[in-house]
């Protein structure tokens, strides 16, 4: 009674799944959830057992339990038992009574979506009901039960993601006592959910960073006493991400800094100077198949790019870029420009000869044609051109050999879709290389029309030069602006432009369909009308007019409407759209530049031979830290905030003494013998006793100075961590 309907088998199972999942779309998820909740409440009201469990009605529960016809296994609308209902409403007494009568209820999960697999222990943990958790564990509740329903999956529909196990639920709600209790009863801290996420992965995804950091430390303290060879922090999920890498992908700077604090080793401190060794495990992209830096720059979340400003990532990237990345990138840019000059020269001096056949069409102006293969390489000039063509073809092959493996490694959608990684430029360069090889095939087979692939290849090849603008801080963000304008503003504008051109070109053609084309031939046929309207739209040409003849009246009306809509409205709209895109990208200028540098550095590091790009950092053996690699960073901390803090403490003390000074002014005998305050010692000021005539003005001045100092202190403390000058060594 109240249980879920039996599941269909075979093709009917897929159909049933489709019909069930149909209403659970992004737009209907809230309605679906509300409908489930309504059915659940109706079912609870219809069942005396469930209603008694909800209202903690112990008298009614005892009567029902004594009734042998009462089914303790009856379930609600989502497959929940009476124990689920009692746990949901924090009714400890009702839950205890139910477990005494039917202990097996402690292990029973919910059977229907969206709460499949949820046990009463999951609910008690989420409610942080410690006593109920103890009671459930005492009666054999499973600490390894998994809640796999749609309500517990990581999805935009759900507001929370706590994993599937009770331990991850307890860690996410921040209950240290329940976490310890579950581990004492055998909960596996290395358990993974259907996504492969451990409890550490799930903590990374929580919005409450404070609880997450505390629970992270607690769980690691238990893992340190385990017998596993691999640390829990190094266990990857199904995407190959460890908790540390997941923090980078999600842009969780708080957790990233917390983990880095656990990994750093302070060498020495001397006044404002501090030398620190930072563990580069999982950070350095050298030899990493799934690079942390590449994951950060390719993340869809803007917060991830803030990781690039954190120590030691900022110092590591800066060192690699200045020492290896920038020199190699400039060399690569120079080689590519020379290569394109060679290709362009070969195209300009391609083998041509006079046309053999006679021209029969008066509109045909062709006088030259391409030579056959046997005639193309005869003279000394042809041999020189052959060398350039071989260089061009070899370069195209090298480009494909470098690009194609990365497509399979990263995936086509991510490789071509990430702007920071240079996605559109990868499409351009691969297309260019393919066109060069196509031209070679056409040349070898004596096929006519090689001018078509050559023309496109020249345009695409020279457009690829813009990729190397990312090596310069002034030009790098502009390439991203161009990409966003082309694939964002321009694409939307082209749809509107196509509609307007089709409409007005048809109107112009119909208007001049009955007129003599010799007098005004811009709209004589439909293709010509389309092209002329396109030129008019972009104001390339002026409106066609012939004042020696009478033009159709409808032409004037149509052209006036076209001029207002196209020129005044749509072109200015397009300019405004591009201006908005420029403003938005300009706000992220520094972030985008840093991300471009990181992506370029990782790309070069992956492509270059190891002897040209040695590993960065210091081996831990030199400091007795094992085989891990470290980056040494020297920080110079500004002590001004500390000095201002002492000033503020002095001012606070002076406030307390103001009242005493007022009393001392009434007693002249004690004016000279008062104790010096901390402020007088700190500032070496005159005696704090002041005459009555000077008291008000002096007190006002001290108050202004004190407030300004407090404001300066708050600003200094907010920015104090970033004021230090950092120097990094290897």
UniProtKB/Swiss-Prot annotation:
Gene3D superfamilies: Ankyrin repeat-containing domain. Residues 1-327, 409-419, 470-492, 578-730 are cytoplasmic. The chain crosses the membrane at residues 328-348, 386-408, 420-442, 449-469, 493-513, 557-577. Pfam families: Ank, Ank_2, Ion_trans. Activated by WNK3. Residues 349-385, 443-448 are extracellular. GO terms for biological process: calcium ion homeostasis; calcium ion import across plasma membrane; calcium ion transmembrane transport; calcium ion transport; protein homotetramerization; regulation of urine volume. Changing residue 535 to A: Minor effects on Ca(2+) permeation. Residues 598-602 are annotated as: Interaction with S100A10. It is a multi-pass membrane protein. Residues 650-653, 701-730 are annotated as: Involved in Ca(2+)-dependent inactivation. Homotetramer. Probably forms heterotetramers with TRPV6. Interacts with TRPV6. Interacts with S100A10 and probably with the ANAX2-S100A10 heterotetramer. The interaction with S100A10 is required for the trafficking to the plasma membrane. Interacts with calmodulin. Interacts with BSPRY, which results in its inactivation. This is Transient receptor potential cation channel subfamily V member 5.
